[in-house]
Amino acid sequence: MRIIENFNEFGEWGMTWRDGELVGFINGEEVVRRHLPADPLPTTLEIAADDTELRAGEKDTVRVILRALDQGGNVLSFFDDPVEVSLQGPGRIVGPSLLSFKGGAVGVYVEAGNEAGHLTLSATCRPFGTQRITFNVT
């Protein structure tokens, strides 16, 4: 057990947090830069699909990841709000339509139907409103 002589060693109650920036280098060359806001706020609902081209009549399925991002583009690790997903077009959502973020992200699967056309996945979450992604089914 360690006795802490300076009680403020790990920060003071009510201290001010400031924005920060992390820069990563490999062999002296900058490879990544991250802005870390002092007060991260839910700013962007990112929708990322593994593919946007699907084949009809083959039960072709794609994974879609939803991420809650702050104003610096960082995942909000403690964000756990519900998100409602819906699909328009010749296909279906595999699983429930009401999901909860875990660690700032949640996944959903979209399956193409038997007809060609376009699928539009909509995701609605309180801080972000509604975001959409479209798939082409051939």
UniProtKB/Swiss-Prot annotation:
Per UniProt, the keywords (alphabetical) are: Glycosidase, Hydrolase
- GO terms for molecular function, please? beta-galactosidase activity
Taxonomy, superkingdom:
Bacteria
Which reaction(s) are listed as its catalytic activity? Hydrolysis of terminal non-reducing beta-D-galactose residues in beta-D-galactosides
Q: Name one Pfam family in it.
A: Glyco_hydro2_C5
Q: Might you give the EC number(s) for this enzyme?
A: 3.2.1.23
InterPro entries assigned to the protein according to its UniProt record, in alphabetical order: Glyco_hydro2_dom5 (IPR040605), Ig-like_fold (IPR013783)
Give the UniProt family note. Belongs to the glycosyl hydrolase 2 family.
Protein name, entry field: Beta-galactosidase
The UniProt gene name for this protein comes to lacZ
